[in-house]
Amino acid sequence: MPETARLVTRDELKSYMNTGTSAVPVWSLIGEGFTALSENKNPKTYARKYIHERTERTDVIGYAPSVPFTADVHTVDPVIAKIQEIYNGEKVGADAQVEILTVREWDIGTVVGTYKAIKRTYSTVCDKEGDGTDALVISGTFHAVSNISNGTFDGDKFTAAA
């Protein structure tokens, strides 16, 4: 019998940041304090109109993904700590890069207990801290610096697809 369609809720789309190292990753949930985190694919297009046609053609030739974020600063949260370390230290280049997993919990992996996931490296561009009068707020944008790596995530470990 075919699966019944259901509405996917926002809490089923999870993001995790590697707050460890490349050699020993620690995937920390991007959640506590975050009030905005949504991906923009920012497709790059090539448009042209040939002399024998009435309609212009447009092809997608690339992407420039970005993920704007806004977060209330919480103490002892490893994701907020990593972002603040980059912001307060005015880090640049590879020192401002983070790995982020995007996990779709409604999209089950082939191994029991796993979900399909995408890993990508982003440059962290924090543009301001201090908005708000109730809580300290930090905001910025993660800008893609790598291609995606498809795989699965079991809540602790990312396994790249073969």
Label each PLM-derived region with a short phrase.
Residues T4-R6, S22-A23, V92, R104, ...:
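Surface-exposed, hydrophilic segments of mature proteins
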